[in-house]
Curated annotation (Swiss-Prot):
Binding partners and assembly: Part of the 30S ribosomal subunit.
Signal peptide: none
GO molecular function ontology, one term from the record: structural constituent of ribosome
NCBIfam families with a match to the protein in the record: rpsC_bact
Organism for this UniProt entry: Pinus thunbergii (Japanese black pine)
Domain KH type-2: from-to ranges: 47-119
Protein name: Small ribosomal subunit protein uS3c
Subcellular localization: Plastid, Chloroplast
GO biological process: translation
Record flagged with keyword Transit peptide: no
HAMAP family: Ribosomal_uS3_B
Length: 217
């Protein structure tokens, strides 16, 4: 029987780097780990709620977190940073920072947030998954959506892309899995620079699961 493994964890330390950089004592490790997840969720919710692009999706590629004793550094890699920087004449980042600090409920730590623009946003699976989710919510046919997403990725010169959507596609009674591929995606090659994401989306027919693998050059 096939064994499934997360493609990012499979390549950690080879072609993928950690997205959280810190050290904690054993008694504090789980607390800090939960805080990291809360920070990422808070940032994603803020961007989706307040700062939306003309296409109506946030465009966050990834969030990196570094910790020191009294300082948390957060770097947001985003496809459309101008929307966050322009919001409220440059106050968008400050509002986000205050929201995260309130969520952490801590007055003795500092928080620094930096924004970095992703040069080619549609090379990132998280951004493509948001695009696909938006189209599925609008009831665009899933095959048309997958082909358009592959076309967007190929325009930005990815070596290969594979998309899988699972659930009650087009409202059919029986759930199924459909996928499409462009180029080559060697999933079993550890040294292949493959980026991956899983993104659930709620539709009127239920929850659909979107998986995207992208082979970078």
């Amino acid at each position: 029987m096939a064994q499934k493994i997360n493609p990012l964890g499979f390549r950690l330390g080879v072609t993928q780097n950690e997205r959280s950089h810190w050290f904690a004592q054993q008694r504090n490790y789980s607390k800090d780990l939960r805080e990291d997840q809360k920070i990422r969720t808070c940032i994603e919710n803020y961007v989706r709620t307040h700062i939306k692009s003309s296409s109506n999706y946030g465009g966050i590629a990834r969030v990196e977190i570094r910790r020191k004793i009294d300082l948390i550094k957060v770097k947001i890699y985003i496809g459309f940073p101008n929307l966050l920087l322009i919001e409220g004449r440059g106050q968008g980042i400050e509002k986000l920072r205050n929201d995260v600090l309130n969520m952490l409920d801590s007055v003795d730590r500092k928080l620094h947030i930096a924004i970095e623009k992703v040069a080619k946003p549609y090379r990132k699976p998280n951004i493509l998954a948001e695009y696909i989710a938006l189209q599925l919510e609008k009831r665009v046919p899933f095959r048309k959506t997958m082909k358009k997403a592959i076309e967007l990725a190929e325009r930005e010169e990815v070596e290969g892309i594979q998309i899988q959507i699972a659930g009650r596609l087009d409202g059919k009674e029986i759930a199924r899995v459909e996928w499409d591929r462009g180029g080559r995606v060697p999933l079993q090659t550890i040294r292949a620079r493959i980026d991956y994401c899983y993104y659930p989306v709620k539709t009127i027919y239920g929850v659909l699961g979107i998986k995207i693998w992208i082979l970078e050059e």
